[in-house]
Amino acid sequence: MPNLQQTASQSQHHLHPHHLRPQQQQQQQQHHHQQQRQQQQHTHHQQQHHSDFPLPDGWDIAKDFDGKTYYIDHINKKTTWLDPRDCYTKPQTFEDCVGDELPMGWEESYDPNIGPYYINHLAQSTQLEDPRQEWKSVQEQMLSDYLSAAQDQLENKREMFDVKQQRLLWAQEEYNHLKLAASRSSLCSSSSSMSRHDPELLRADLMLARERVHQLKQELTHITNDISYTERGMNTLYSVGEKINARENGCYDIAEVQAIHEEMLKVHKSLVSGEKVREELMRSLVQIKNELGRQQISEENSDLASPFDRVCVASQTDLCGSSGDNLNEGARFAEMAKTTLQYAEWRKHIKKLQQQLADHVERIEPGQLESDKDRILLIQEKEKLLNDLNSISLKSRSEEEKRVIHQTRHKLEEDLKEAYEANNTCVANRLRFHEEKQLLLDKLQEALKSTKLLEERLKTFSSESTFSISSGSSLGSLVHGQHKSALSFTDIYIDPFAVDSPIDVVDLRRRSQRLFQQHQQQRLHPVHPVLQQQQSAEVTLSPRSSLSMETPPASPMKYNAGADQTPQALKEEPTYANALHAPPAYTAPPPVPISGVRARPYDLDSTVLDCMMLEAKLQKLNMGTPLNLAVAPLSPISEKPSLLDLPQEMLSRSSSTSNTRSVSAAVSNESVAGDSGVFEASRAHLPRKELAQVQIGLKYLKQEGVLVVSLERANNLLALWTASADNSQVYLRAALLPNSLTSIRTKALGDFQKPVFNDTFAVPITLDKLLTKSLQVTVVTMTGQKEEIIGTVQISMAEFNPEDSTLKWYNVLSSKFIPSFESLDIPSTSAAAAAAAVAASNAPNPGNNREESSDESTITSSQTSTLTRNQAPCMELQEQIAAELMGLGPLNEPECSDDDDDDEEEELEDKQLVSDVGLMNSSSMLHAYLQNMKQEFADKETNTDRAYLPEKSRGQSQLMDDRPVKRSQTFTPSAAVSKNRYNCRLNRSDSDSAMHCGVAPHTFQRGAAERRSLRYLSKAPKSVTKLHHTHIPRTSLDLELDLQAQHSKLYFLNDQIAKLQNLKEVLQKACDNKDPLVAAWAIENEEFQRLVARADPAKCPEERQLQKLLMKTAKEIHKLRKTKVPKGCPDLVSFKEKITFFTRKGLSVPELPSEFTLPEANPIEEEEEEEDEDEFYNSPETAIAINTALVASSNRNKNLSEHLHRATSGAVPKIPAPVVTPAVTPAAAPAATPAATPAATPAATSAATPAATPVVSPAAQPDAKAADAPIPVASNDAEQQRFDYVVDRNYGVEV
């Protein structure tokens, strides 16, 4: 048995070989011939093995219980792992090593959890770093450089705090002067001649000044939080560097690495449980916010129809599978081939965008954007302070105050000039790169939306086939059982939920430059925007005046549009209040619902087959040529009568906010003239009984990207229907042409005279695509199982104004005016056919019940396929296309899985969301379709009806064997099909019905015992352990940064939970008391709206799925960038992202202001209440104090940085981590939010109290579900005491 001293130990005597590498570099040119001679000797040594040399005398070989060889020295009575013959075959030092060699005494080993590590048998130690590389010294230098840059960034934040504090001083002084004037005005109110100012104007100015002071205080609080966050991150980085440098060799041994790894897993479990608590709290806040919004609705609107009263009238039965025999198969498969081609192009576009983003990441320095943002914000703050000083009246000021104000102005102007010169030379290129990156991100998001839409459509096509996509057929679904034992880079440092949306620095810089140019040109007068006046609703003498009014009965569509919005979002006028809630230009637009299926209460059902069938029929019509009609139809332009001619009931329901443009309703010469602007429309007639008309409402929601179509009612449809209407029903069907993805239909009614449908649907479509389409509404009658189109309405969306909503009557063009219009027999859209479809789906199908597990089933299915080879060509081609759809991976399947296994659990979670539909070869699809339409089928004397192309020849057009070959109907693609498509052939000599054509043919053995119907040469399972987990080296500094990042995330997660619980209690109390002030804050506060928008349950599943796709795309971009790193070389960008993670601002939870929770006092009475508080600001030496603070700002920052440098370079006192017992609830602990006061310094205001917030221990249970209950804390964690917390002496910030 070997001695334990040879195994991995925790001795502090480590060999540090790094000092040998510089010597090798210095002597490389001097001893070049010596290195060549050593290489020749090394080549000679490599040819010699241990077996070529005998063991020395007194040595013996033995094996341990695990099979590892060790050696016994009988002379010294010792055991060792080292072969005594290594002195003949291995180099002695690192200088003698060539290539990837290790010297004598060193060994490379592998651990399944931590990866490769190295053993020094001579020093009896282990370490994580590769002794042949100098990556550790490069990391230390990068960390030191970043800390210097972060110190500059912190000084910019402190200077910004000083400038904003000076602005607060001036604002407070102005507020005090206004209060004094208001009090004097109130005392002299009895005599108007003694009052110099209007009391009402003074009160209004006082309120504005008060709001300004309140806003500046809030901004000071935000800056204080930023300073505290940055200081905490910097102190964490300082402590990590000190901890690594404190070790003798600067490396962790294998035992410490394993302990850190276990601790990271514990913290990760606590993070998972804490995120569940946070999500539950945010969902509760969404509910409370909605309740507060409902309380804000006035009583006069209480009688309006609620947007939630609408019930989805979409079809609840899947009618696709039972109508395959009666549908136009040609149009359907042609559309499928076109969709597949588009899907392939979008996939290529996504890969290209990912590659471009991976290239852009290398061009942008991590953390540089935040520094540029702080510089630009500092410039803006100085500009605002300069404007405040310029607006001060100097009449009542003393000479000393005037001199100080002039000096301050001059100093600010010089600072701004220098800052602009520096920014123009340094920041321009970085901002250009950032702007390009943002553009690529927007394109990537749009590409993902379009690709997901095509995926849903392909999934709809595949659902019509006899094959069903099972959840177990996805690749990798059987290998997810093992628990992931390692945390990757993306698991730790990519957390989109915890990071606020980035600020558009480009727009910020442009605005700052405009302000500077205005100041340089002395254009300080305010620019008032031109107010757009609303159009008058009066009737003019022009015939076109009727186009500016509508005949709109009150439609539920106008209220359903805001079913998932706040009451403020229902306001469509571009007011200032709406501008506050509108997302800024730099933020990504909200995810657009990909499909209309179950997206909202009024959503439609994706009856794609009905719409495609309708398009196929309409393509046969000659709509472009003029029709010689015996009776000319009326003008299709939707004219509106004068208000004098309208009935009283319609006059009372008219609206003044209508569309000013007309919409074509049918095809005629008058409609073309009307659209061109030449035709002067005559006075519109009132709806007459002999005309068939349909009332349609249209509204476009820009934020959601949804067109709301309201099919309200119809009038006199009997004019279109000549048969008896006793046993018939009528319904409306609508679709956006051309290339419609969805069709919508209303419920069927038996009333042909005045049917009232009142059905509202939402069609997700972008605005640019909407303006190129036409809305076609078809009137369909249903008699039993026979359906017939009796009329149609065509509305050009090019004339639709998306800024306004319309509700109009449209004339219906009868189908008898079109000679080639055929009746449509669509049993799938009737209720009787729905029942028949359900009965047919429940009937047993002998062909589909068979399985491929036996040879008998294969023989039987081959006989069936041979007899029915030339029958039902469309269904066979449908099965073929469905099989191809199943044979490809999903959209978000990672391309490179050789280095990271971190996506396995996420793929398992997304298996229910992401459809298992992929890319198909468009050329083979079209060729198969043409061959099917020609009724040409190959007879290869086999029982295979589908020839799967191999992976390498997907894009090549095959001239031979391209015709679809029928195969067994019982064959179902297995999980392996999702990666490699293959040709299914019958090898009669071996009785294999589906053999891979890509593998080498095996030798035939007659009478073999194994089953030959099984797949030959199945793919071997992936090995559990890989020898090289990643080719990028990892050091102890990386490991310590990962651990501290996890602890930082846990700390801020607990802080967020405490703030969310406090906010929930306050809002819930205000909701119960119906407090209007708190309700107004919850609805109008932008920060709170952004917070609750992350967890709004009203989001459709497609939006959540798109967010997951974006997250996976970010991980794929990281993998693409990592593949560019040469093997063995460090990843510099990833390490920079690690260290910038600590100073990156996380998710901010807004705090409810105390002014909104208490009743607001009278401004004059409040003067007495705040008299003591404002004594500091009533000093006549305010201007001198401001100038003194401005001059001393830079000196104080220098002193602070020197103190911080001395504190971090010297001995730092360490204290044990605070332990919070589970009895302390988050609600009882005060929130650790530093409150900034105007008189406070940044050093004092940045002091945080982390001990006051509840702490989630790494041993917390992951199944914590209660939102109000604190996460349990472990009491016995001896390993956690190893990670100390450092307290900065100057600022008191605990790390």
UniProtKB/Swiss-Prot annotation:
GO terms for molecular function: kinase binding; molecular adaptor activity. Keywords: Cell membrane, Coiled coil, Cytoplasm, Membrane, Phosphoprotein, Repeat, Transcription, Transcription regulation. Residues 895-909, 1163-1176 have a biased composition (Acidic residues). Residues 690-810 form the C2 domain. GO terms for cellular component: apicomedial cortex; cell-cell junction; cytoplasmic side of apical plasma membrane; Kibra-Ex-Mer complex. Residues 200-228, 334-460, 1048-1075 form a coiled coil. The keyword RNA-binding does not apply. Residues 856-868, 1247-1274 have a biased composition (Low complexity). Residues 941-965 have a biased composition (Basic and acidic residues). One of its GO terms (biological process) is R8 cell development. It is found in: Cytoplasm; Apical cell membrane. Residues 1-59, 540-559, 840-871, 889-911, 941-971, 1153-1176, 1247-1278 are annotated as: Disordered. Residues 53-86, 100-133 form the WW domain. Residues 540-549 have a biased composition (Polar residues). Forms a complex with Mer and Ex. Interacts (via domain WW 1) with Ex (via RXPPXY motif). Interacts with Mer, Sav, Hpo and Wts. Belongs to the WWC family. KIBRA subfamily. Regulator of the Hippo/SWH (Sav/Wts/Hpo) signaling pathway, a signaling pathway that plays a pivotal role in organ size control and tumor suppression by restricting proliferation and promoting apoptosis. The core of this pathway is composed of a kinase cascade wherein Hippo (Hpo), in complex with its regulatory protein Salvador (Sav), phosphorylates and activates Warts (Wts) in complex with its regulatory protein Mats, which in turn phosphorylates and inactivates the Yorkie (Yki) oncoprotein. Kibra acts synergistically along with Ex and Mer to regulate the Hippo signaling pathway. This is Protein kibra. It comes from Drosophila sechellia (Fruit fly).
